[in-house]
């Protein structure tokens, strides 16, 4: 099952399914906001989503724009994609209410969603309101900071992956909450190649660097293990930052003189840009 509003992406998705022998892919062409019944009928257990980060507000239901102010008539979605998670959360909540009326137990749904880092950092205005609303009925299981230019040669936005359990409140009835796992997953063993994109690298034995890195990342996540410079766990609310960089400890053993010099260069460039010092 799937929903895609961009025509070329929809064509690629359906063609790919046909090539792999699936003649009934159940991929809908259109806006997810017009596919509520389709989503409910699919009865999802796992949702993978990459919402648009700059969707036009005109295509978003008015009920989700009540607190947007002038932005509701603007050119871009001020939530940077969070509103799409809110919408799916509401559908799962509605499904659970219907299940309870029919004497059935509530269900939970795992969701992994790609979003710009700005949504994880945001602690003000509309983005914070969306984060607070999300945790009312859902649990933030993990947030992974992804490699720079993950979409190369496409969009250059810095992205993260958020993992939620929909249908399970972040704060339990007794007031406690589960610690969220944060991964600083910047180095994945791929390198940028012009005209090729991000290319997988191999070691001297011909083994995939990514495969070894992937296994380590999954091990840390499954065990909720904190490793300096790579991962951390913390209790968070919608008012906090949702990025590993805010909680992990620095692994000083891996710092080099080059890292120190680069930091100084970046700071010097910032001072010059702000007009606080001038090149002589």
Question: How does the language model describe each region?
Answer:
Residues 41, 48, 53-280:
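A conserved structural/catalytic subdomain of Rossmann-like adenosyl-cofactor enzymes
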Residues 1-46, 54-58, 117-118, 130:
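Conserved S-adenosyl-L-methionine
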């Amino acid at each position: 099952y799937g929903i895609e509003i961009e025509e070329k992406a929809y064509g690629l998705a359906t063609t790919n399914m046909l090539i792999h022998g699936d003649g009934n892919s159940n991929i809908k062409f259109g806006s997810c906001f017009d596919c509520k019944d389709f989503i409910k009928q699919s009865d999802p257990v796992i949702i993978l989503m990459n919402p648009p980060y700059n969707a036009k507000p005109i295509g978003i239901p008015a009920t989700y724009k009540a607190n947007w102010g002038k932005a509701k008539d603007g050119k871009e979605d001020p939530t940077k994609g969070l509103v799409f998670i809110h919408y799916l959360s509401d559908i799962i909540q509605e499904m659970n209410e219907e299940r309870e009326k029919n004497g059935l137990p509530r269900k939970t749904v795992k969701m992994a969603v790609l979003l710009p880092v700005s949504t994880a950092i945001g602690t003000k205005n509309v983005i914070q309101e969306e984060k607070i609303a999300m945790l009312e009925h859902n649990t933030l299981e993990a947030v992974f900071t992804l490699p720079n230019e993950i979409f190369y040669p496409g969009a250059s936005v810095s992205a993260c992956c958020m993992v939620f359990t929909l249908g399970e409140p972040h704060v339990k009835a007794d007031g406690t909450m589960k610690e969220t796992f944060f991964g600083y997953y910047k180095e994945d063993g791929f390198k940028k190649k012009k005209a090729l994109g991000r290319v997988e690298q191999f070691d001297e034995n011909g083994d995939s660097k990514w495969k070894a890195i992937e296994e380590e990342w999954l091990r840390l996540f499954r065990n909720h293990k904190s490793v300096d410079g790579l991962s951390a766990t913390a209790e968070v609310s919608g008012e906090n930052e949702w990025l590993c960089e805010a909680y992990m400890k620095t692994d000083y053993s891996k710092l080099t003189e080059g890292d120190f010099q680069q930091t100084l260069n970046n700071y010097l460039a910032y001072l010059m840009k702000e007009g606080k010092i001038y090149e002589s």
